[in-house]
Amino acid sequence: GLKEFREGGISIGPDVISNNIGNGSPADGFLDYADTQKWSIIPAIQMMANPSGIVMQEVIEVFYKHFFESFEQHCADIDGIFLVLHGAMVSEGSDDVEGDLFREIHSRLTAKGVNIPVVAVIDFHANVSKDMTDFSTSLYSYRMNPHTDARKAAVEAATLFGILMRGQKASQHHLGTPYVIPPTGLATASDPMKAVLARARAIELQDPDILCINVMGGYSYADIADCGFSLNCCTSGLASVAQGYLDELLIVFEANMSGAYPKEAALKMVLKCIDTEPRGSGPILLVEPADNIGGGTPGDGTGLLSPLLDSGR
């Protein structure tokens, strides 16, 4: 609810800029690049919270109120809309919060006869829907998991945003898949993500028409229709060529798919291994990543606590 977002941070208007400059976030990356380009930024609202459960409708209403008040006031004077999103939000009223937002922005732009690019930087764990791609000009996802490149991805997304604002024509193409991958299978330093991302970067280098290719691992704990691994491409070239690249990347994924579903060790086996190892002088760390520690959560899930207590430890 709003309590968690207030704790995470709600910034409105100019506070969006002052609260992000220099903090190393994606918003900071965008603002820094915008400054180098001498863009005039009209900030609307930023809301943040730790990853958690379904978002209450009151949160969506607050965001819409401030965002679209700013939109209506400045729509006739802006050259584009840039969003910093996660991409896997589920609320009380919608399984596709970001898709709904893009649809509403597109609807209002169309009603006013305004044709400007709408670009968003999104998380590698985004569950990308058809509405997210149909009603945006381009998405741009993080390339690394853990997300050490979040700020860099925002700078690259802002660079693409500038190209589109200068009049570059582009189309966006998406390929959803039935593959729902646990967080433990999404490390970008290991296959299949490593192989898919390497091929995506090679395609971008070899074909100047490809403005970006996004590889999204998806967020498996969201039980929604668009949950899972997906691919996305923004191109200034032929749609058929872009779609062919996405099909090729899916083949690369499927050829390396075994790594996406690692065999997890049972707790009893882990404890047995611990007991048979020579006792060291330091603590033993038992890391349980189920609450998505790679995405910034505190790692304080208690799912293992009961069986550990049952074992007498």
Ranges and model annotations:
Residues 165-194:
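Internal, active-site/partner-interface "lid" segment
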Residues 10-12, 43-54, 84-86, 249-255:
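Gly-rich Lys/Arg/Thr-decorated short loops/hinges at beta-loop-alpha junctions or inter-strand turns
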Residues 18-26, 48, 52-59, 63, ...:
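Catalytic cores of large soluble enzymes that bind and process phosphate-bearing ligands
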Residues 35-39, 43, 69-79, 270-284:
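Glycine-rich phosphate/diphosphate-binding loops that line cofactor/substrate pockets in enzymes
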